[in-house]
Amino acid sequence: MSERFFSETPITGPRAELRGAEAHHLTRVMRAAVGAEVTLFDGSGQEFAGRVARIDREGVTLDIVAARAVNRELAGPLHLGVALPKGDRQRWLVEKATELGATRLVPLICERSVAQPTPSARARLERFVIEATKQCGRNRLMEVAAPSTLEDYLATAPAAARRLFAHVPDDPSGSAAQTTSLAAALSQAGHAPNYETFVAIGPEGGFTPTEVAAAHKNGWQLVSLGPRTLRVESAALALVAAIALRKRSDEED
């Protein structure tokens, strides 16, 4: 059985417990019995070989057979600030950002935001992260941060980090001359492979001219993703994928 299961409780001893959805998946969906061997992770960066020792109404108890540190993270943190779209598109965005290696997702509150982040929505996104992490093999969870205003997100990103602000260059803000292509921005020298990256993606209606001016004032680099208008989730994943590939290329050089 090659399925991976997430332990909400840190695994520090010879046994682990699965409860709730994870226990249900293991026993009801996978039909695991006592003696079945599975892979566990707890978000610490390690993964564990476990063997089912007991199944009862409370959940599943597993013996920890082995622990191993397996690093499948990007070299350097990648923070994805994005004005979330509505509905199921949120799930798709979160799943793919997790698979591509984003470290943290920050729901942005912008002037034209269409989806307002709530505590229940955040809990739902965190569950999407767990499911995607199980599938893709990461041993650390992408953090779903508390919602942030765009102003705070722009101001708190360290000046030493690479800060990329997705921008449509032909808008009426007058900032076309300040915008560069994503490829050109990522090819610029001056960053080690483990550099920290912050990305900002606007809502369906785009960033307002005031927001674009604030990004430029705070030292963010305005980047274009090409001549086509992309939906929020497409723009977010285009940026994350390009950055992830660039980081891998820098590691190999």
What are these regions (language model features)?
Residues 1-69:
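N-terminal positively charged helical leader segments and presequences
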Residues 14, 34-36, 46-48, 58-60, ...:
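A generic structural signal for short beta-strands and their flanking turns/coil linkers
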Residues 28-59, 151-189:
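N-terminal-biased segments
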Residues 35, 97, 129, 215, ...:
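Residue-level signal for inorganic ion chemistry
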Residues 65, 71-168:
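RNA substrate-binding interface of SAM-dependent RNA methyltransferases
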Residues 163-214, 220-224:
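Active-site/ligand-binding-proximal alpha/beta "capping" segment
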Residues 209-253:
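Structured adenosyl-cofactor binding patch, chiefly the S-adenosyl-L-methionine
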